[in-house]
Amino acid sequence: VADCDVLVLARYMQILSAEFTDQWVMKIINIHHSFLPAFVGADPYRQAYEKGVKLIGATAHYVTADLDQGPIIEQDVKRVDHRYTVTELRQLGAEVERQVLARAVLWHVEDRIIVFGNKTVVFE
């Protein structure tokens, strides 16, 4: 693991310790299945459904000791309405998650991201 340039968390669903994240500053990328800062933590599609949202999304971000609070690398959304079930939201969101995570990892390995405070600048 010591020779890795990036760690990618896809459906990992575990909280990393501060000791671990401090060793990998801005080198761990997580995909969160909501448009952060909305619906932090577990089961965001259910949270979105219960709020009756009109957009669902995904966020790729660098992992910090604070859950789902790291600098955002990429986000995208899809429009939904009251007819969508939680299962349908998850299915639609899965494709958004794949696209967002792929772009974030690509930009990271191509050194196209600068982190400034808790924000990122991504060069195209």
Task: Place the predicted regions along the sequence by residue.
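Donor/substrate-binding cores of folate-linked one-carbon enzymes
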Residues: 6-124
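Glycine-rich phosphate-binding loop signature in dinucleotide/nucleotide-binding domains
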Residues: 1-4
